Amino acid sequence: MAAVTNADVEAVDFDPDDDDLMDEDAADPTPAPAPRLRSTIAGGGGGGGGGDDGQRKTKGRGFRDDAAPRDSRLAGAGRASDFDSLGSDGGPGPVRSIEGWIVLVTGVHEEAQEDDLHNIFRDFGQVKNLHLNLDRRTGFVKGYALIEYETFEEAQAAIKALDGTELLTQIISVDWAFSNGPVKRRNIRKRSPRRSRSPPRRRY
């Protein structure tokens, strides 16, 4: 009986180092894969909330909240109040801008300077603002200017006196920048009807 016991002991005998290795293998199981996170763009979140898709809002260029009132959307642009300030009595005629009475000058020479316009328009009143629109590519004037007066009488006097006059070898046109009623077109040439080069057909 003792011999059998010794044989059994010899059969199950093992190295202590192998026992340590087995313990380490049992203590370090294969780590479980991390849970997949939902994209924040899709409306979910890494925190596990993200189930309320009905309240999800899409932000970015080209998107807007249609449920918001139209006035609130326009308020951010800062332009609605400006147009509300444009006064008018409802009839045809010039309209005052927010700051004053603005005169439009067309036919301006491409090399004209602000001083060239200021010197002739200041004779009719205080010029509050003068703007020359330049071409970014060439740096020359695009051909028109905006001049602002404080009073209606000053702007009207400048229009009557300077419309059709010469500035730097070019004839300028001076008129109201804002007005009610039909738009008055200037310097528009009427084209003659085209004539056919083919000989007229003979009628039988």
From Swiss-Prot:
Compositional bias segments (type: Gly residues): 42-52
Major location category of this protein: nucleus
Segments for region (Disordered): 1-92
Localization, UniProt: Nucleus; Cytoplasm
Ranges annotated as biased composition (Acidic residues): 10-27
Record keywords: Cytoplasm, mRNA processing, mRNA splicing, mRNA transport, Nonsense-mediated mRNA decay, Nucleus, RNA-binding, Translation regulation, Transport
GO CC annotation: cytoplasm; exon-exon junction complex
UniProt-listed GO biological process terms: mRNA processing; mRNA transport; nuclear-transcribed mRNA catabolic process, nonsense-mediated decay; positive regulation of gene expression; regulation of translation; RNA splicing
GO molecular function (one): mRNA binding
Domain RRM: 101-179
Superkingdom of this protein's organism: Eukaryota
Pfam families the UniProt entry points to: RRM_1
Family statement: Belongs to the RBM8A family.
Record's function text: Core component of the splicing-dependent multiprotein exon junction complex (EJC) deposited at splice junctions on mRNAs. The EJC is a dynamic structure consisting of core proteins and several peripheral nuclear and cytoplasmic associated factors that join the complex only transiently either during EJC assembly or during subsequent mRNA metabolism.
Name of this chain's protein: RNA-binding protein Y14A
Biological source species: Oryza sativa subsp. japonica (Rice)
